[in-house]
């Protein structure tokens, strides 16, 4: 396959470094409400979901940060052991189905998917997948590669590797190790010409899938270095594939990338026994040394390796011509060769048609995924709209209640002011009536006392008068008796003013102000 085919199959996103935010301050959470990663991996989905709804967002972020630290493995074997325990707990459960996971809390689902896949990208705040996508990834119905996200099996592949390997995606994962990365336009990956499965070059070398074999084009003749696909057991030529990669991608590589790619080619053709493979191996080693020692720049090395491929093609053409020039071709053999050329052309046309059909299916799957994503977003937007309308109606109801209470408060304040004024008026009336009654009582009391004093004075006057008349009759003409009579007479007539004054001074009631 060419580099364009590689780029079509591999994801073109670079592997970005993830900067995690600093841990934020967490509000105090009681020990009874706390949740650990072991609780999430072990307890029922609905129980953990209910507990998570009562926890603050800061605590949930702390849970995700803790799992990210474990997945990073910064603490060595301790973190690896913790992750294996969590993964074993999750993968041994039979209750984690689509029916139960649909009711899971968002953070709970992200943590479960990260534990099951071992990928911390699902915990990153800038990556937001729909709940449906997360459930499909957990159940191995969607590719766990965030940059791929194809439905599984990809391209409806019916190979045993795709149908039996849970979560395997033939568009972005290695057939042997089932891992993916973001390397494109490189000899790090080897693609199968027939099944379009991909394999790491390192994995293929380790599993001895790169070896000498018969020529792929003719099926006979001199052997060459070939790659045997583990998924379909078919073989693919390596020299032509390496040449296509270098012709399409080498001009854009820098010095370090070129050294790395030359190293891959050297390792691929290390065990080659044909002349072309050995020449390529020797030339790659020579160019690597020159690049490392700064004796040649990357552009010159790129031109040199491309020249090597041209020379190898020329040598191959000459060797074939020399081999065929020594004998005459029979008519039947000529017809067979023509038929082979036609069949090869038909095979290539069918391959191109199949490739276009796979690309069409992939595009259709991508469109369907986008439609589902849009439907999910529309449903979420509808839920948010309903929630917003509900909140708006609640706010309006609260505002109406507040206005009603304010009106009641104003009314009660008005009545209180009126009652206060009425009480003050009644108090003034009561004080006025009290003062008037006191004055009347005092006047009547003084009049009564004055009448009593007058009556007593009149009584004494009459009594003295009678006594005087009796004494005059007994002793007429006595001067001392006449003097006593005049004193008593003065005392009676001068006494009432003093009595009135004493009665006023000794009156027990208060005077008017």
Curated annotation (Swiss-Prot):
Chain coiled-coil ranges: 372-469
GO cellular component, one term: nucleus
Keywords attached to this entry: Coiled coil, Developmental protein, Host-virus interaction, Metal-binding, Nucleus, Zinc, Zinc-finger
Region called Disordered, residue ranges: 493-513
GO biological process: one example: regulation of gene expression
PROSITE patterns: ZF_PHD_1 (PS01359)
Location(s) in or outside the cell: Nucleus
UniProt-recorded name of the protein: OBERON-like protein
Principal location: nucleus
Purpose of the protein: Required for the maintenance and/or establishment of both the shoot and root meristems, probably by controlling the expression of the meristem genes and of genes required for auxin responses. Involved in the development of the basal pole and in auxin-mediated root and vascular development in the embryo. Confers sensitivity to turnip mosaic virus (TuMV) probably by promoting viral movement and multiplication via interaction with TuMV VPg.
PANTHER family: PROTEIN OBERON 2, VERNALIZATION-INSENSITIVE PROTEIN 3
Zinc fingers (PHD-type) by residue: 166-235
GO molecular function: zinc ion binding
Gene from which this protein is expressed: PVIP
Lineage: Eukaryota, Viridiplantae, Streptophyta, Embryophyta, Tracheophyta
Pfam families assigned to the protein according to its UniProt record, in alphabetical order: Oberon_cc, PHD_Oberon
């Amino acid at each position: 396959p060419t580099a364009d085919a590689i780029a079509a199959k591999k994801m073109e996103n670079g592997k970005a470094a993830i900067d995690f935010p600093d841990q934020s301050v967490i509000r105090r959470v009681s020990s009874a409400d706390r949740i650990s990663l072991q609780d999430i991996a072990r307890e029922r989905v609905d129980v953990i979901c209910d507990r998570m709804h009562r926890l603050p967002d800061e605590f949930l972020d702390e849970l995700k940060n803790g799992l990210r630290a474990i997945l990073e493995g910064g603490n060595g074997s301790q973190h690896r052991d913790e992750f294996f325990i969590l993964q074993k707990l999750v993968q041994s459960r039979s209750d984690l189905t689509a029916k139960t996971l649909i009711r899971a809390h968002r953070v709970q689902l992200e943590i479960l998917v990260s534990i099951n896949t071992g990928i911390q990208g699902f915990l990153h705040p800038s990556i937001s997948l729909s709940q449906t996508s997360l459930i499909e990834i957990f159940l191995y119905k969607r590719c766990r590669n965030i940059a791929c996200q194809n439905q599984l099996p990809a391209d409806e592949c019916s190979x045993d590797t795709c149908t039996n390997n849970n979560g395997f995606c033939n568009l972005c994962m290695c057939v042997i190790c089932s891992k993916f990365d973001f390397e494109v336009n490189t000899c790090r990956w080897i693609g199968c010409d027939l099944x379009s499965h991909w394999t790491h070059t390192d994995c293929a070398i380790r599993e001895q899938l790169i070896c000498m074999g018969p020529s792929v084009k003719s099926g006979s003749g001199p052997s060459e270095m070939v790659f045997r696909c583990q998924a379909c057991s078919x073989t693919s030529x390596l020299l032509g594939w390496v040449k296509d990669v270098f012709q399409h991608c080498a001009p854009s590589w820098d010095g370090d990338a070129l050294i790395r790619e030359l190293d891959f080619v050297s390792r691929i053709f290390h065990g080659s026994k044909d002349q072309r493979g050995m020449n390529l191996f020797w030339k790659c080693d020579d160019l690597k040394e020159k690049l490392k020692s700064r004796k040649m720049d990357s552009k010159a090395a790129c031109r040199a390796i491309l020249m090597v491929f041209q020379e190898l093609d020329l040598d191959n053409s000459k060797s074939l011509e020399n081999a065929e020039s020594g004998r005459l071709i029979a008519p039947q053999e000529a017809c067979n060769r023509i038929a082979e050329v036609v069949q090869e052309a038909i095979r290539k046309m069918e391959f191109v048609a199949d490739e276009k059909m796979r690309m069409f299916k992939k595009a259709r799957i991508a469109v369907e995924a986008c439609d589902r994503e849009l439907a999910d977003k529309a449903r979420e937007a509808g839920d948010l709209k309903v929630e917003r309308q509900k909140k708006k109606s609640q706010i309006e109801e609260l505002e109406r209640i507040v206005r009603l209470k304010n009106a009641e408060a104003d009314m009660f304040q008005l009545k209180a002011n009126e009652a206060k004024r009425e009480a003050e008026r009644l108090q003034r009336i009561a004080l006025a009536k009290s003062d008037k009654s006191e004055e009347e009582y005092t006047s009547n009391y003084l009049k009564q006392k004055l009448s009593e004093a007058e009556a007593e004075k009149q009584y004494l006057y009459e009594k003295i008068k009678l006594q005087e008349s009796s004494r005059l009759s007994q002793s007429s003409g006595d001067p001392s008796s006449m003097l006593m009579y005049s004193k008593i007479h003065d005392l009676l007539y001068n006494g009432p003013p003093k009595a009135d004054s004493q009665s006023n001074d000794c009156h027990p009631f208060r005077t008017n102000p």
